[in-house]
Design a protein with these regions (language model features):
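A short helix-coil junction within the Rossmann-fold of NAD(P)-dependent oxidoreductases
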Residues: 5-7, 22-23, 49-58
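Conserved NAD(P)H cofactor-binding loop of Rossmann-fold oxidoreductase domains
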Residues: 15-20
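Substrate-binding pocket helix/loop in short-chain dehydrogenase/reductase
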Residues: 23-24, 31-35
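Residue(s) in the substrate-gating loop at a strand-loop-helix junction
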Residues: 67
């Protein structure tokens, strides 16, 4: 459709998200299908279509919005975390594949972002933003675009999120399971 209209896409931003809370076994199959389609199939098809055009032109930018959950075992959002892990690997693979043709691909891995995705009252949102636990959407977009135009393959906005991702990558699975069994932590999930 865009090619037929003579529209050339120079920057593609794959940024869509829907959260599926609760145990996976209790999730309606059609909801699981929707999250996989939105987070995996749609970006893959868009990147295939517009990435090929960019490759032929020898220039272009693709930003793939993933999530810090791509590195974290996260009970109650297994489908979300798994699809965001797909996007992490997908963005990295595309970066290797397209870089030699002048197309830059950046994966962005924010933590909690202040969007309607989270059902929080205003005071709680302000606190989380002030403490750096949650980021404003504008900040995440700014960090992601800066990384994209600088040719970086990945971007983790926010100090708190960087620390969480680092810890989750270093902590063995058995220790993570123990932490998730602590009553105060378990209540969060």
């Amino acid at each position: 459709e865009t090619s037929a209209r003579g529209i050339e896409i120079g920057v593609l931003v794959c940024n869509a998200g829907v959260l599926l809370f609760g145990p996976l076994a209790a999730a309606p199959p059609e909801r699981i299908g929707r999250i996989v389609t939105l987070h995996c199939t749609t970006p893959a098809l868009l990147c295939r279509l517009y990435g090929e055009e960019m490759r032929r032109r020898g220039e272009g930018y693709i930003l793939v919005m993933s999530s810090a959950t791509a590195w974290m075992p996260y009970p109650t959002i297994a489908a979300y975390a798994a699809t965001k892990s797909f996007l992490r690997t997908f963005a990295r693979s595309l970066n290797f594949e397209f870089r030699k043709y002048g197309v830059r691909v950046t994966g962005v891995f924010p933590g909690a972002v202040d969007t309607p995705l989270y059902d929080l009252d205003a005071a709680c949102r302000r606190r989380l933003l002030r403490w750096g636990v949650m980021s404003a959407p504008q900040e995440v977009a700014q960090h992601g675009l800066r990384a994209l135009f600088r040719g970086r393959s990945s971007c983790i906005p926010g100090v708190f999120t960087k620390i969480c991702v680092c810890v989750c990558r270093l902590v063995p699975a058995w220790l993570m399971r123990c932490v998730l069994r602590i009553p105060a932590v378990a209540r969060l999930f």
